[in-house]
Amino acid sequence: MANQNSDLYKQITAGSVAAVFQTTMTYPFEYLKTGLQLQPKGTAFEIILPQIKSYFVGCSALNVAAFGKTILRFVTFDKLCHSLNNNIDNNDNFQRLTGYNLLIAGTLTGIVESLFIIPFENIKTTLIQSAMIDHKKLEKNQPVVNAKATFHNMATKSTPVARIEKLLPAVKHMYQTRGPAAFVQGTTATIFRQIANTSIQFTAYTAFKRLLQARNDKASSVITGLATSFTLVAMTQPIDVVKTRMMSQNAKTEYKNTLNCMYRIFVQEGMATFWKGSIFRFMKVGISGGLTFTVYEQVSLLLGFSSRS
């Protein structure tokens, strides 16, 4: 039992280092993806191309989330593996799970992770939205609407986007202006995205793996990974766009709820808007897996345990 706990702590340490490293290295893609998703139709792309340092605005929030999420992931998944495994007589519970039970464990773990990171995602979105906007142009073009609100149009006075640059001031501003609800915006879309992510990734990976099973080489592994990432992004990007919009600083004045957000994006901006930022998300997803695995392997060796245990 002591050895199992020791290995779990080492896995958490290796996983945390890998998660923070991967989050930092791929964050510019996250910044550009989120920036594009927040931009209304017809807004110039140049607005979200600021100084290089701006590409890491909000990264601190995701790094804190990555650290906490990794701990939660290993502990939750370990507990679920024990609960779903009827034949626990060794330390290799993960490999002994059936495909169906593995999917359940992965999905439930993903939902728990998603609930944990929602506040940090909101902080990140607030910081990115502030950093990417030319506030002088925004103030000149800020619409003021006083007509009656309808399902098609949230006709309330537009809320200006605040200029915030750091983590703690962002938390303070969000609480003061929007209350505790500011940290749980986009919860519905986030949960649906996580369920879709886990299900599609598991299904797509299995399908491509079987399709290329005759080729047992590194090339087939790379192709499988890229094809899985492409399928995942293509099928879940609309949910990701809705999630980002619902986490924006002015979401309450723009949308009544998640369904209204989807409807208004479709009617006012067109179907193509649902795939905004997909190229940058694909780059992030495609790089993240290999980067995380490589760092995890190296840290595992330094800690003196097998990463496959």
From Swiss-Prot:
One of its GO terms (biological process) is mitochondrial citrate transmembrane transport. It comes from the Eukaryota. GO terms for molecular function: citrate secondary active transmembrane transporter activity. GO terms for cellular component: mitochondrial inner membrane. Keywords: Membrane, Mitochondrion, Mitochondrion inner membrane, Repeat, Transmembrane, Transmembrane helix, Transport. Solcar repeats lie at residues 6-83, 97-211, 216-302. InterPro entries: Mit_carrier, Mitochondrial_sb/sol_carrier, Mt_carrier_dom_sf, TXTP-like. It is a multi-pass membrane protein. This is Uncharacterized mitochondrial carrier SCY_1795. It comes from Saccharomyces cerevisiae (strain YJM789).
